[in-house]
Amino acid sequence: MTEFSHARLDGKVYTAKEIKEIIKANNVKFIKLQFVDINGQVKNMSVPSEQIDKALNNEIMLDGSSIKGFRSIETSDMFFHPDINSFQILPWRGSDGVNSARLICDIYNADGTPFEGCPRCNLKRVMQEAEKLGFSMNIGPEAEFFLFAKDKEGNVTTKTQDHAGYYDVGPEDLGEDVRSDIVLTLQEMGFDIEASHHEVADGQHEIDFRYADILTAADNVTTFRVAVKAIAAKHNLHATFMPKPIFGINGSGMHCNVSLFKDGQNAFYDENAEYQLSETAKYAIGGMLKHVKNITAVTNPLVNSYKRLVPGYEAPVYLAWSLANRSALLRVPAKRGVSTRVELRSPDPACNPYLAFAAILETCLDGIRNKIDPPAPVESNIYKLTSKERKKQRIDALPGSLAEALEYMDKSLVAQAALGEHIFKEFMTSKKKEWDSFRTYVSQWELDRYLERY
């Protein structure tokens, strides 16, 4: 069975000796042992660089009871297992002005087994299931974000940095310099940047980086979010990956370009098949369409996520696939051959990428195992169809709220298989509490509408 690890763009496979030499040559003082919790929040323990041997020998412990969704206090001893290929000197200095480096870590139990609640370990488990069928998955994520101004006291506002639109340039696009700084920083960290541009909404931006294997892609999304926030802060701005921070304009998505490979070849491509899409591709599409409602709580995990998933703002709402039609949930871009892929348009950038990518992979595998045929592609603008027309074409819709998404997820064996027993249980518990907190909160909208009238 393959031991999956982070794949560097330069193909470099580090040794412990090389890492220690880099640390010494660059006067690195601290090593950040980084991981994510079940909600995808980045956590880290910082250790002096003199502890690098101990870190690389998997000897540094953490208290799992202090991490939401991990361990109870009586079984809380856990260990960092760094992925040596993820070593990276951070291009920005902290407030202390010293150099730091980062290692992305798996979390292991005290008995030396992978912790079933570690999102990164869980993704590796699902990757091993795909490997048994001969498949590996590549994903190219397209994460959007907003840049907001800060007030004189440094507090975050919802005032966008500019009022530019899609593909605009300066002087309307005031974020151009910030984006350039982010791109240069990401390139310094080993990212292959393909494009950057202003998005549709005021203050909204997108930076696209090259696809990678599913584990490396999840690592990259996590690193991307940290880097974007760090560089924005340097410009006295706040970057947010909140899906819908402002009412009435487009929200931020994270379209995922998905492809499966087998024996080194793109398994979605068949030169002689209809649309040049292989049977494997069609089964994967069938699996995604069948199960997408069951994993939407994972790919769109916030109460706020569902403010984005509404008609009228270019967000996918309806369950259909197409060859070019951007009103469909799944789209097959024009390129074929090694570039054949399916674009899933519903995920948002607030998701835990390790869990979201595991869920996407599991839906594809279920489609392949059970030979789930997709319906015919829909090439008309689904947003313009009446509800009667959609019903006639059997075009369903995504869940309209986190509560509805959790109801679908709770009954889904595919979602349970994707997350594993521990994460599934902890995720459901956490998200139900989040919904209850929102459901019982008295909002300003209610006060404005009801306080004087009633």
Segments (PLM) and residue ranges:
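Glycine-rich, acidic/polar active-site loops that bind/position phosphate-bearing ligands
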Residues: 2-454
